[in-house]
Every structure is written in C-alpha cells, then in structure tokens.
C-alpha cells in the first residue's frame, strides 16, 4: 500500500504584536521617512482613452529616494490572484452560514520591480498607501505608510534592521501516515507518465485553485473584523503567487472561509491531528459545495514543538490529502507566505532540502527550518522532486485554467508600460528621453524598429547572433539576438543529461549536481570526494551508511548504488585511510548524495539508487 507522507516544518516563532504596522510593534531600530511621488500616466491636459473606471489602476509608478538615491517603483496589478467564481463564507453568531461572491477584480495587490534593476522584485499592497517589500541590489526593504495616503510620509527600512527575538533555526522530521487505505491514493500513486508527457506537463502553465480557511483564533486575533482577516490573507497570497511564478504555477484564490462563530474541526497543539481533522472536513464537507484543488488552514493556535506548518507530501489533487495547516505566528506577511509556500511545496511532492541542495540567492524555500530571513527561491533538489512528482502522479487538477479575473486593460499611452496596441511607451512627452519613440502616440518614430530592449541599439534590432546574455555556467546557454526582436530570448539551458563540469555530472534543469560540489558545500573549498572505498560503508545499513529509509529502517545500498547513499569526503584535516561524512540527528537526509548526481556513465542518483538518465531526468538519450 502506498502511504502518503506528512511533513512538519519547525520555524522560529515571532509572536504577533497586535499592531497594524511593523513600526508600531517597536521592533524597528532605524528607518527613513520618504514621500513617494506618483508618476502620472498622462501629463495634465491630455485626453485619456476611455476605460472602465477603477479605484486601483492596472499599472502604477512611484518615485522616492532611499539613502539619497532615487528609486522608481514600477507596479502591475496581480490579475491572477482570484478566480472568477471566488466566494467568501463566514458565519453569524448563531452559526448560520453566509456566503457571498464579492467583486474582487478591482483590488490593490501588486507585483513589480525597481526600474533599471533587473534582479529586483516588489510585492506591494496599495490600498491605503504603499505597504510591502521590495528587493533591490541584493537588499530587502520594507515600506509602509505613516499616514493613509500613497503620497504622504512613508517609512522605509531594511529588513535586516528589524530586531530579532530568536535567530536559531529549528528543525523537524517527517511523520509517516500509516492510517490511509483510500483507493484513490493508490491509483494516483501508481500512475506513471512517459518522459515525453512528463516534459509536456512541466512546460504547461499550471493553476492551483486554492481555498483558504481562517480559524476562530485568527478571526479574534484581528479584532473579529472580517475585512482585516481578508486583507491579511490576500497579502499572504500575493507573496505566495510570486514565489510560484518561477515554476509556471499560478496560485489562484477560489474561496475564503472565516470560522467567525466557532471552529468546524478539532484544532489543538498537535499539528498532525489538526491537519488530519482539516483534511477530513475538506473531504466530507467542503468538496460537496465548493470545488478546489487544495485547501490551507490558517490558524492562531501554537502547535507543539514549535511546528509552524504541516502538509501531506504529494497530496495535491487528492480528495483526502490536498491540504496543509499554517500557523499565523508573525506580523510579517512574507514569513507566513514563506511557510505556506513551503507546505504547498510538500503537497506538490517536494521534500525538505538537505545541506547539499543549493539556491542562487538566500535561503531555499524547502529548508527544513527557516530563520528570520525569508527564503527567495526553490533549490535544485526541489526542482527534482517536483519533476518526479509530475512524472509519476501527473496532478491533472492543476493543469486546467480556472478562469481567473485576468482581463486585458485598455492601453494608456504615457504610463511607461508597453501595452496591447502600443509599439513603445516612454512616459509623458515632458519626461520622455527616448529618441526612438513618439511619446504623444506611443508609436515608433519613422524607420525605427525598436525603442528599448537588450537587442535594441540606436533604434534598430541588433544583428542576429549578437550576444545579449552570457552563459553563467556549464549548464546555461548564451542567449543571442535573433535580428527580428528587441528582446533577448528567454533563458535556456542545456538539455537534461548534457555532460557538465568536465564530465563529472549531467545537467538537470540548469544545474550541475556533482559529488565534488556537494563536498565543498559541506566542508569548504578544499574538500574533495573520498576514495571509492569509503562509499562501501553504505552497504552496512547503519546510521552513517545506507541508501534510503523504509518505515524508519536504514536500507543498505546494493553494490551498484553505493555512490547514491551517504556522501563521503576528504580534506586537509582528514587522517590517512579515513573519510568524512555529515550526519544530523535532527535531519536524517542531511549529508546524503543529492538526487541527479552522476553515479556512472549515463547514470544518476534517484531514490537512493543509481538509475539511467532516461528514467531519472525524463529524457531520451
């Protein structure tokens, strides 16, 4: 019988301060007062094209100074936040269910970036002033209004300037679910997708129709105010949306339920009992009157053992296990969003990262423990797990389009955004400095082919074959201008299975996992892979030498799989005829060889075995 797995994540606890702003919590050591100036979409006196009146524009641009340097914040409304059939449910004091379908298209939740900073991001709530985060030049900043207006005083401060109560990361382990006997789980778990179909699934745009539930403690925590609760959840989901864009997944809110009278399930300090109770409620109650792909419970309870979130591994699309439970433990919406992103990752088949899993910047989302610094991206291991999940389970429910409120807005010339029907948009004529664009009409000047872009030079397309983005490593590819477009083509990588690092490894979704890189990650730049004799320890099946675990038992490696178990390394401090390995009582997977690592010619590690490239990476050799 295939048994789904529950994983709990333990994080640092930062208690809610009972305040509407971070500044009022008293945890900010230093901040700067700024006055954002909204850059008008159109100069005074110009006629704006007719469009439906909305309170919140589809695109906005603000300018202010941070540390004396000008910052231009470009914002675009997150039009993939809600499903068209979005509903809200709460309960009267006598327990009567009240369900409405409120208009949510004209909302105030935005994603964006800092102008002229390609690696910047921004997540902003613009309901009453600008409230949120932006990342620029590797620094994460918080902005929040001091008064309820987008043009009056705002506070800007570095995230790192916040006082931290407990910086020690906490860890936790996996819990086997031994009680499931559902036939649906068996059928889904035994499904296998061909490599060709799996690649098709990976490239397809995916949508998770998410149903959010706030328990009675959360409702009371926010002064028993439904509006405040919904704003909190919308803000959290706006962050979650941004995290999943890299996987081509849109997390779309299909419903919000607030247990305003009393909890509908048993919620207590046991995270496992709570999530099982929530899963049973979803199956027996929720799914009968509201379709959804996944449901997440936001609770005000403090789980035992500092657990902040829990979910079923690989439970997505399953009527019994497509759920998670998240503790609302922090004033910072981004930290709650990080936990929810992590738990959704488990539902999508992702396991906890080990020490050898790497990210380009900052902490990885699927680390078993998080500290005060929010994560930025999924690791190479998470990509592997997600690909394996798609290949073996297919998760059909996330492949349908949920009919989001993604309505194409009428183009407005002069707002600085190139929209449908425009050839360019350099802003109002009085500020436009682009020699290729007619600011008044948003059309290219005569004989101009382009106005901006990495492959645009002096108003003409750069020649085909000219470099516009250099390869970063062995598994990346140079991007070249096509001669037919101003934009640099999308980032492409060598095919999965392409040899890399002097034939030490094979490319996997743009990374090159090798034993050497993993040793260096664990032991420093002088570390090397240990002699083959050290890996023979993996045939012992003890705590320091095994290939995989089954029901808590260490399974020894078969001789052909020894390079896919515990990782053994050496460095200058290693004594002769000995080898080093990494072991942690708190994280059993720590120090194991990373999936996708080369273990022979045409072979890579997967599931504690040395298997063929075609099977492991979903490719045809």
Curated annotation (Swiss-Prot):
Residues 410-496 form the Disintegrin domain. Snake venom zinc metalloproteinase that inhibits platelet aggregation and degrades fibrinogen. One of its GO terms (molecular function) is toxin activity. This is Zinc metalloproteinase-disintegrin-like NaMP. It is found in: Secreted. Belongs to the venom metalloproteinase (M12B) family. P-III subfamily. P-IIIa sub-subfamily. Pfam families: ADAM_CR, Disintegrin, Pep_M12B_propep, Reprolysin. Its cofactor is Zn(2+). Zn(2+) binds at residues 342, 346, 352. It comes from Naja atra. Glycans are attached at residues 225, 268, 319, 551. GO terms for biological process: proteolysis; venom-mediated fibrinogenolysis in another organism; venom-mediated hemorrhage in another organism; venom-mediated suppression of platelet aggregation. Gene3D superfamilies: Collagenase (Catalytic Domain), Disintegrin domain. Expressed by the venom gland. It is an enzyme of class 3 (hydrolase).
